[in-house]
Amino acid sequence: MADAETFAFQAEINQLLSLIINTFYSNKEIFLRELISNSSDALDKIRFESLTDKSKLDGQPELFIHIIPDKTNNTLTIIDSGIGMTKADLVNNLGTIARSGTKEFMEALAAGADVSMIGQFGVGFYSAYLVADKVVVTTKHNDDEQYVWESQAGGSFTVTRDTSGETLGRGTKMVLYLKEDQLEYLEERRLKDLVKKHSEFISYPISLWIEKTIEKEISDDEEEEEKKDEEGKVEEVDEEKEKEEKKKKKIKEVSHEWDLVNKQKPIWMRKPEEINKEEYAAFYKSLSNDWEEHLAVKHFSVEGQLEFKAILFVPKRAPFDLFDTKKKPNNIKLYVRRVFIMDNCEDIIPEYLGFVKGIVDSEDLPLNISRETLQQNKILKVIRKNLVKKCLELFFEIAENKEDYNKFYEAFSKNLKLGIHEDSQNRTKIAELLRYHSTKSGDELTSLKDYVTRMKEGQNDIFYITGESKKAVENSPFLEKLKKKGIEVLYMVDAIDEYAIGQLKEFEGKKLVSATKEGLKLDETEDEKKKKEELKEKFEGLCKVIKDVLGDKVEKVIVSDRVVDSPCCLVTGEYGWTANMERIMKAQALRDSSMAGYMSSKKTMEINPENSIMDELRKRADADKNDKSVKDLVLLLFETALLTSGFSLDEPNTFGSRIHRMLKLGLSIDDDDAVEADAEMPPLEDDADAEGSKMEEVD
């Protein structure tokens, strides 16, 4: 053999290997599923390449997976005639470059996840070390020579050019040197059971090298023939007599042969009524590398001008990289007339349905279709439209069971909201699937449909409030009047709600109205209208004083009928960002700051004329417009309103200082420290006693 090159495992991979080797896992059997799955992927790749270039299969025309148990040497060998690996592939993929999932998988394990999740994180190969203490990989790619990779997982591995003369033609051979306590994986029955359990629906023949013992009946003279020939004796006996006396004897003859294990035809070609739950679960697990069963399944065929069959699965959990934009979606496998074409076709299903797993087998697409021509293909557009329709049907079926739908919604509500934002064609349909907490729903979630059925007489709009969390919005000043009138308000506390609601303007003819934006119209009696006009007139002077103090911090100051208990609140323009949206946009590292200029709309301060603080402030302002304490109190009220209305403070230190000085006044503490006069925050008057009584008013 040529000289071996030694490489160190990348740190994270080394950590993962030591975790796999040194931790006890009860379900080590999943290693076989992972290795067969890798072989299947390698076969998919070469088959796809061969569609446009037949010569790619010259090295080995047959596509297969072979499993060879060797009880003499305690090894288990898995051979596939897939695409193989070049030397660079061997070095990179099996050791020196950590996949994005390596770290996540270790974190998941530490959090108590099952080792059988390994395939979902793209590191399934290393599961071989669950049962083996040494692994040797021999591989041949069409573009390179044959190489051997070897490691006992002790921090390093070697790669050598294979000069043994035993050529693969093309593909990969993995030899697992099994640990002493893992020899059960050499038993024919155990291996067959595992293939049937995990890999029954792999679309390539999986054959097991089995030992067959046949009992053969032979006569004594057949057995002794050779002996007689050697001795050279010839006896002449009566033929009839010889036949009678001839004794029969049984001997065991041992032979080896390939036994095809996965004999099932593709599950999607069978009728749904013929397939039981267990078969769907087994197919889902082999398709997705998930260790859990699916939450729901949709098996259907479309016939007519266009023909295709499909099976779609909804998982129980969201994958760790659900919204990883760098990762290409590969959850829908595309087949053409039972031939696998690709599993990362971005156009087959919209991004918001990226969590749905499954297969599509088309009768109409050309076999040699490429990713480029696929994008313009009209057939694919029709398939996509049908898949979206069937996915939504499936979600409505899940919604019939409240418990299942709660699980589904917890995992995939963001996807539905992304669908509202992106899919204008199905927006109203998806809106029916949305669920929210509300002022009347308690711990339960409510649908928009249910909200509409509970609307008060004369109520024409659906009211909602956006914010950081349910806790942050449930006592918001914006809800005071609505609650008093018994009007239900939906809590939209997911960041993506802001984007979704920007697109979903109405539901069943009812306009969606934000409780935090100006222009909130509620039904009023004649008496209420009259009283409002009187208060407006009474507080006109204070509104002007507040506007003068705050300057361009607010666009206008008006008397509010929105707040009942709080002294004031800050509302945004009808078409600008809400406070919550402003918070979200500020948090985005790559935000477009020019956009913030015109989207973060001017704030309107709405004051509550029936609040005692505001009434006292009005009296002081009317008595003396230049009262310095009025300015300080207005600034303090503005800053607290910023917080209670969901905005962030631009100058938290100034706010802190203002509060501390108010506390000192309230506690009658003299502030001897020289304080510089601040135009924004003038010092309070020296009369501590008088201010103390004022402070009681503020409290």
Curated annotation (Swiss-Prot):
UniProt region (Disordered), positions on chain: 219-248, 674-699
Alphabetized CDD domains for the sequence: HATPase_Hsp90-like (cd16927)
Ranges of biased composition (kind: Acidic residues): 219-228, 674-690
Primary residence: cytoplasm
Entry comment describing in which tissues the protein is expressed: Present in all tissues. Most abundantly expressed in roots followed by floral bud clusters, flowers and young fruits.
Keywords, in A-Z order: ATP-binding, Chaperone, Cytoplasm, Immunity, Innate immunity, Nucleotide-binding, Phosphoprotein, Plant defense, Stress response
Cited PROSITE patterns: HSP90
Outcome, altering D80N: In hsp90.2-3/lra2-3; Loss of RPM1 function and accumulation. Loss of ATPase activity. Loss of dimerization. Loss of interaction with RAR1 and SGT1B
GO terms (BP aspect): chaperone-mediated protein folding; defense response to bacterium; innate immune response
Locus of motif TPR repeat-binding: 695-699
Induction of its expression: In contrast to other major heat shock proteins, this one is also expressed at normal growth temperatures. Levels increase only slightly after heat shock.
Phosphoserine: residues carrying this PTM: S219
Gene Ontology cellular-component terms listed: cytoplasm
Phenotype for R33H: In muse12; enhances snc1-mediated autoimmune phenotypes
Described purpose of this protein according to its UniProt entry: Molecular chaperone. Involved in RPM1-mediated resistance. Component of the RPM1/RAR1/SGT1 complex. May stabilize RPM1 and protect it from SGT1-mediated degradation. Associates with RAR1 which may function as co-chaperone. Possesses ATPase activity. In the absence of heat shock, negatively regulates heat-inducible genes by actively suppressing heat shock transcription factor A1D (HSFA1D) function. Involved in the induction of heat shock transcription factor A2 (HSFA2) expression in response to oxidative stress.
Family under the similarity heading: Belongs to the heat shock protein 90 family.
Domain notes: The TPR repeat-binding motif mediates interaction with TPR repeat-containing proteins.
Subunit organization: Homodimer. Interacts with RPM1, RAR1 and SGT1B. Interacts with OEP61, OEP64 and OM64. Interacts with HSFA1D.
Name under which the protein is recorded: Heat shock protein 90-2
